[in-house]
């Protein structure tokens, strides 16, 4: 991002953060650079953006990898494995990451892209078992069945994002997430006291049902992750549970189980078991 921004400023002699319809300032920078004679001097920038979905709201830009069906011309059966290895795994980090385009800072840094067992070679059951055998710590957590939302305290205010939206005025899920944040005082206090951390939540709502069936009483924002905006370090589930208890907010569960236990129990789960 900074490279493209600096190149635009060098070639054009100014910088602008304006949008044009759905085109973000980043789209326009690359478009403008490629219109300089001789045209299309920056194919690598065009290629980089071709696999991204961008969403801008003022000075904030959300970057997310595109849907497989878009990237691979409708071939949704393609696993997309190539996507996650090119550009040194750049797209793995583009999972609704949000940057301040004016000050060149990471604002929200959610989980990097992760995969199901046997979805890729790196997550084959054999490789996972090998990594567990060499790991210092292994944690098993309940995977809630909602939508990811992330939040942080930035420049004196709460900033939230969903999977594809940074503007609550255009996303009812995100708008609902903000309401949930302000319903419990612990959320805002936690965000204020740890401004350089992205807090990652599972948004559970009866209006946003998936496979698992939840009750009205189970609606809310469940703390499922924390990540440093400065280093990218992810916090352990043990730390997450401590934060949730300290600030009295809902969270996930961790279990004292083996991988074999988990794999066996998966076959016995029904759609109303969270």
Where are each of the predicted segments found?
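Core nucleotide-handling region used for phosphoryl-transfer chemistry
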Residues: 1-274
């Amino acid at each position: 991002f900074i490279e493209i921004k600096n190149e635009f400023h060098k070639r054009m002699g100014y910088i602008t953060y304006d949008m044009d319809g759905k085109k973000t300032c980043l789209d326009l920078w690359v478009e403008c650079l490629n219109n300089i004679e001789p045209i299309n001097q920056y194919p690598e920038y065009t290629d980089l953006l071709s696999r991204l979905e961008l969403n801008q709201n003022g000075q904030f830009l959300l970057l997310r990898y595109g849907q497989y069906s878009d990237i691979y011309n409708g071939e949704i059966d393609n696993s997309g494995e190539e996507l996650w290895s090119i550009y040194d795994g750049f797209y793995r980090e583009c999972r609704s990451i949000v940057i301040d385009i004016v000050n060149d800072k990471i604002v929200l840094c959610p989980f990097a892209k992760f995969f199901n067992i046997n979805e890729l070679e790196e997550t084959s059951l054999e490789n996972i078992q090998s990594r567990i055998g060499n790991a210092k710590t292994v944690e098993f957590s309940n995977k809630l069945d909602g939508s990811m939302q992330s939040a942080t305290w930035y420049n004196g205010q709460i900033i939230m994002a969903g999977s594809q939206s940074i503007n609550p005025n255009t996303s009812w899920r995100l708008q609902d997430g903000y309401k949930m944040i302000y319903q419990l005082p612990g959320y805002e206090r936690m965000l204020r006291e740890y401004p350089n951390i992205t807090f990652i939540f599972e948004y559970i709502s009866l209006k946003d049902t998936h496979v698992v069936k939840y009750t009205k009483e189970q609606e809310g924002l469940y703390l499922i992750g924390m990540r440093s905006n400065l280093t990218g370090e992810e916090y352990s589930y043990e730390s997450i549970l401590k934060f949730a208890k300290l600030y009295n907010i809902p969270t996930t569960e961790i279990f004292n189980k083996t991988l074999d236990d988990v794999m066996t129990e998966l076959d016995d789960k029904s759609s109303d078991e969270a």
